[in-house]
Amino acid sequence: MSESNSAEGSDRSEEQVSGAKVIAQALKTQDVEYMFGVVGIPVTEIALAAQELGIKYIGMRNEQAACYAASAVGYLTGRPGVCLVVSGPGLIHALGGMANANMNCWPLIVIGGSSERNQEAMGAFQEFPQVEACRLYSKFSARPSSIQHIPFVIEKAVRSSIYGRPGACYIDVPADLVTLQESTTSIKYKECCMPPPLSLAETSAVRAAASVLRSAKQPLLIIGKGAAYSHAEDSIRKLVELCNLPFLPTPMGKGVVPDNHPNCVGAARSRALQFADVIVLFGARLNWILHFGLPPRYQADVKFIQIDICAEELGNNVRPSVTLLGDVNAVSKQLLEQFVKNPWQYPTDSKWWETLREKRKNNEAVSKELASKKSLPMNYYTVFYHVQEQLPRNCFIVSEGANTMDIGRTVLQNYLPRHRLDAGSFGTMGVGLGFAIAAAVVAKERSPGQRVICVEGDSAFGFSGMEVETICRYNLPIIILVVNNNGIYQGFDADTWGKILNFQGTATTIPPMCLLPNSHYEQVMTAFGGKGYFVQTPEELQDSLRQALKDTSKPCLINIMIEPQSTRKAQDFHWLTRSNI
């Protein structure tokens, strides 16, 4: 009896630690650096504990934006960011960010508070089957069974998020576990998980791929964001230059090899895809972005060489001639070695190169002609050509919107890998400001002086516009360009809008695509202490952007009015499903 009392007294005298602090320490041990979230019951203590250990916490205004930001950190750094949310509705708001991370194959950890375990099935505050709900949107979804179990679950979540094809993972933390105290000696932290193992393709398959590429009459390399994530820029650029091959980047593959490289045929995209006879896919999937690899966008007998980290991705939609399973950078080096040992170069004077150069020149001329129009309001091309003239070559470009993103991608150049973030594989609107905040936070430490330019359509800006307050609160010198056409796809000018309002019943007469004309979005920025500009002419755009780039002490929003009916130049093929409107 006395021994028992002595043991109990000893336990009480031992140093205690809360579940919140165990979570924070486990994250720190796994080299997690960034956390984004919206705090409240029961997760506030977790954010405070994380800050005590030096984990950077960025408080956002909406869980979706927080989740988008955390996922972008994962893409930019290769280590998952954490999204911290409250239970029930807070977690549900983050599901969009989890799905987006999974679709883009970006590492992400979502930590969600949940109702107390002893209230399960009783109708507890914000009770929801969170672990089950997150399984559809994640690689791994679990709830620690005890405080002692937390380090194990966190290590597994971090490891799962970065191993194989990266993706989202969810950790559910009941409210009672956050505040529960346990002896520090009972907690065993897991060692930091090792970097993902690098997998190489089979040597015979690499030789076969080199042979197919050597036999090509009209070759093309397609560089995807998987190549950017794996840091394959050096090996792919060497392959491009050694073999004199034309390449085409996907939207977030831009910058792996600079857009101004003479072998870039982005301006001849449709022609390159339609007539290539051998295509090498570097971490690019044959999904909707690449038109599934099917006719009429491609030749029926085109040969694909597919390089991907994920075996399940190989052969989707089209049977490839050669599959190279492995890390994109490692496999690119293997392929490069084949041509270093046995040099081969695609002839510069070939008919294929002549066709691509001519199409590239013609398309660039059409865009420049549209950009040179002096009429007001401005069109998209005029805006983007003036922006491109002033953008620093090392800046991050974040972009979302319909025409704003599609046209901007063709004009705004990327010269560095992992410096473009956009709607991505899921085509998600609302990612812009979250992505921009993530890029600015990462750049502040890893590449000081690099600016973040966030190019938003006016409709897209509306999804996460209140994150401007977050930007100002943390004084992130982000430049937001809102390309304002008064609508979704297209809008109306003030005169036409006034006539519409003369009809009775605005809910039945205002077209669904229309937004309020001449909205002063720049005042959202000035309301929180940043700088704002309302511009209507090329001269005003040039002056405001020049001032914004010069001032690194404050964020800025430039509200750029354009022709409400402005659209893209004529396309050879429709980008997505045709609309009957």
Swiss-Prot record:
InterPro entries reported in the protein's UniProt record: DHS-like_NAD/FAD-binding_dom, HACL1-like, THDP-binding, Thiamin_PyroP_enz_cen_dom, Thiamin_PyroP_enz_TPP-bd_dom, TPP_enzyme_TPP-bd
Broad enzyme group: lyase
Binding site for thiamine diphosphate: E63
Molecular function (Gene Ontology), one example: ATP binding
Binding positions (Mg(2+)): D458, N485
Pathway note: Lipid metabolism; fatty acid metabolism
UniProt subunit comment: Homotetramer.
pH dependence: Optimum pH is 7.5-8.
Domain of life: Eukaryota
Cofactor note: Binds 1 Mg(2+) ion per subunit. Binds 1 thiamine pyrophosphate per subunit.
GO cellular component: peroxisome
Pfam families xrefs: TPP_enzyme_C, TPP_enzyme_M, TPP_enzyme_N
The entry's keywords: Fatty acid metabolism, Lipid metabolism, Lyase, Magnesium, Metal-binding, Peroxisome, Phosphoprotein, Thiamine pyrophosphate
Name the UniProt record assigns to this protein: 2-hydroxyacyl-CoA lyase 1
